[in-house]
């Protein structure tokens, strides 16, 4: 409920202003108020987010290229991030691609393509989830993923959960405000918020169903952090019939998801 209200309020204010986060506060504030400061904070938050988001997008692009050319024998997340030249190269490619895309009409071009790409990614994730359920370690992986262990909950876990919630809601960086500016005034904001929350949660649960059975099947460390997605998915595709092409499609869709 709190997530729904947080998203809904951001969309309401932004749709009313029809402007970027910085100008949104300036347009809605009354004389003598200084809400514009929060627009600057949102801008700083976006810059901080992009500082690592562009790097992660470069990692995704790297895996897409590796699967596309069929050179997946030397995959290894640790080796990849240890190569600064490789990381900087893919980072620059991502930045250039982002600037080029932003120079076009987003609603007329990128938005239309993204709708199809994200639908295809969702279908592919459903296929991969079903495939993961056939792994030898599926039962153990699902038990680890879905059966709660309340004894493991401590302050660190709570803080990590809150960090994830704030990240998903784009709290503090004007994310909801940006999305709200593109919502037509004929759309019901509460309904849109509910749909986004449900879809976001569904995709997150689906990702867990894909990843954790594979971890227990291939002996991967479930607490590996950012490398979990890349190492796990590479292992899944390497053991699938036609895995090279499944992997190519998956990381292609992920590239579009990250860029959008």
Predicted segments with their positions:
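Single conserved hydrophobic/aromatic residue that forms the stacking wall/gate
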Residues: 2-13
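Membrane-embedded alpha-helical segments of transport systems
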Residues: 7, 44-54, 198-207
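Residues within membrane-spanning alpha-helices of integral membrane proteins
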Residues: 8, 40-46, 91, 95, ...
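Membrane-water interface of transmembrane alpha-helices
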Residues: 14-19
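Inter-helical loop and helix-membrane interface segments of multi-pass membrane transporters/permeases
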Residues: 21-44, 54-107, 136-160, 226-230
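Alpha-helical transmembrane segments
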Residues: 48-51, 55-62, 100, 124-127, ...
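Membrane-embedded translocation segments of transport machinery
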Residues: 111, 115-259
